[in-house]
């Protein structure tokens, strides 16, 4: 589990990439301005859809604002000089002849190649119709490994960057491998509006993307059906920055014991507006931690992470099926929606189906989690997807001198002892719907504003809509629908946190949960 330090920042799309379809997640108070340009908004205010509508298969694409320096169309006949009229037939030839900082446009089609990126700072842009007059979606241009034992795209040591926009990258030992030789940190690799599918091996880390001491920006993309020992979608290590936003991670499988979708040894991390669905860890060994995301420390330096506006559902692990904070990492979470995740049973007990916080071992080496405005619900299922007969720590499970603080959050129906920590841990809960006590002997502080109602009144749990009902109206995809009842979560956040970011009428006080303190908060009656 040890790796050199990484800085991972997952956030806003680079302006040079256009036309992505973002996953839908709880809206931020800041609005939709941080989303990438494209066919779907990721935003706040009154027009962002709820998490029951998350389903992105092929990101849609807009025309770039600039022009190309080389063109590729595998169906081209006759001479090939890389012009629009006589495009190259292979990507390899375009990469070899493109000038520094060149932009390569690629027409729809299937390209069976193993590419080696030159050190030119190139950008490869796919999804074009014949003639390059328009673009369709990222599934139109497919780059598939000719030799499945090699990565589809390799960036050797010394390559200072590469851009990928609007491509499907599939069926290689890795989708993209960018690793340094132990020298100075390399340049930036940018992925936008792409699909990484069916990549990886069971014994290598980072099936979709493997970054070692290179910077990266990933936005509006889809990672599905990738596999690896750890980090089936993405593994990152080294003193780097990595930005990812508005991307979907689904059915990625880790065959070893740490990190189903993301395996990040990071110095700083921000993971925002992504959807993690049906990822798993422990496929071969029968146990593992961090089905969706693991952020782990390395003992050598402070490790910080920030997760916000993400959706986690149906992920599987022994503990921490959604999120695992490990080995001294310090992480914040806000406005994340975590529901119906699964945990392997050990001795008949399913543990920690949502969040797991574990230290490195010593009294000063615990991990730290500070969380605000979470909705953590129905995380009491076993590996088969059936309700667990016995569960423990379904909301949060803590070990080894770790500390966690939760405010303005909702913990609902997460099984027996949903808040659990061993005697070395400290757990603080304030202004939340949560149990009044913790299991496992942890130092448990249940402070002001904590209560546990008999009913929560989510809008529609069966359809995964976790907005709260209100007689004044709940957000419903651009409209406001009035309900017969009002959820007890409305206007129950910390009074010091006003309701100014919520739609009127808002009672002057924010709601609890992932949608509280956003433009999608249910109105106050």
Which role does the model predict for each range below?
Residues 75-79, 102, 109-110, 127-133, ...:
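Acidic glycine-/aspartate-rich tracts in secreted/extracellular proteins
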Residues 92-95, 100-132:
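N-terminal extracellular ligand-recognition/capping segment immediately after the signal peptide
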Residues 122-173, 193, 198-200, 452-463:
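Right-handed parallel beta-helix/beta-spiral solenoid domain characteristic of secreted/periplasmic
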